[in-house]
Curated annotation (Swiss-Prot):
This is UPF0337 protein blr1496. It comes from the Bacteria. Pfam families: CsbD. It comes from Bradyrhizobium diazoefficiens (strain JCM 10833 / BCRC 13528 / IAM 13628 / NBRC 14792 / USDA 110). Belongs to the UPF0337 (CsbD) family. InterPro entries: CsbD, UPF0337_stress_rsp, YjbJ_sf. SUPFAM superfamilies: Hypothetical protein YjbJ.
Length: 124
């Protein structure tokens, strides 16, 4: 529990008590002061709740990230073993696929021939 939640609840309670005293005494200034303190306590309590929610969300996200990181090596290993089995089962097909991928990459990475800039003719 966040400190702001505790302090906010205490301020809210004190504001309610002060407002009740103002109601009993018939003092408008004490009533207004109590309502203001109660509102400030409510706001501080809500702020503490928001901080707690953010802290919980960040801890949960960190836990998910740690789990994903821990399992990523196993997933990579499984994928590598599956590819190795496919290559051993069909080496010619794997060679053709690798050659096709290399050819496609070469086409993507090659630059087109540079054309000379267009010449402008001025008619005067």
């Amino acid at each position: 529990m966040d400190k702001d939640r505790i302090v906010g609840s205490a301020k809210e309670f004190a504001g309610r008590a002060e407002g009740a005293v103002g109601d009993l005494a018939g003092d408008a200034q004490t009533q207004a002061s109590g309502k203001a303190r109660e509102a400030a306590g409510t706001v501080q309590n809500l702020y503490g709740q928001a901080k707690d929610a953010v802290r919980e969300a960040s801890e949960t996200a960190a836990g998910y990230a740690k789990d994903a990181y821990d399992n990523s090596g196993e997933t990579f290993r499984d994928g590598s073993q599956a590819i190795a089995r496919k290559v051993q089962d069909n080496p010619l097909g794997a060679l053709l696929v690798a050659g096709g991928i290399g050819f496609a990459l070469a086409l993507l990475m090659s630059r087109p021939a540079r054309r000379p800039p267009p010449r402008w003719r001025y008619y005067g």
